[in-house]
Amino acid sequence: MLRIGQDMSVHRGEWRVHASAVDDIRVIEDSLAWLCGDGVSISTQKEKSTLGAPMYTISSSMTGKQSMFSLTRLERVSIEEILLSGLESRIDEHKFLHLRIDLAALSMGKGELSLNKDTMVAKGRFKLEVYPGQSAYEVARSIFEGLV
């Protein structure tokens, strides 16, 4: 398993995008494929929104190694922002790390963190590999420090 930092890693990860019928689904699928790397399948499901309009959920599920590769696609400035802007607030009680990547930037091959709640995003969720005696925050910090 690819390790970054002081032998820190993730168990698995996923990226998910919610899109409307007017969005270019193929561009979103290609963007997620770039973000995840080779060997990760991208699935697209057509659904109806709560108001009945057609919508799509485009998602990927990754192994630990694939997840770590995906994190290397983040722009350096985004990694630094994650480290400076409260990494703890991105980790939930189940030791999942949550990220939001700007979809417009992603479609241009850039893994930029989204800080704007009104933009379309790819939502990332990564299960941190935390063992007894470790804190989820320290594991996540070590991963991102290893990426800088």
Label each region the model flagged.
Residues 17-21, 36, 62-66, 103-107, ...:
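Beta-strand elements of well-folded, non-transmembrane domains
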Residues 35, 55, 65-80:
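Acidic, Ser/Thr- and Gly-enriched intrinsically disordered low-complexity segments
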Residues 74-109:
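Mid-chain, well-packed structural core segment of small domains
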Residues 101-148:
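Glycine-rich, aromatic-bearing surface loops/beta-hairpins
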Residues 42-66:
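Short, charge-patterned binding micro-sites
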Residues 1-43:
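Long, hydrophobic N-terminal alpha-helical segment
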Residues 28-31, 70-78, 141-144:
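Short amphipathic alpha-helices in soluble, non-transmembrane regions
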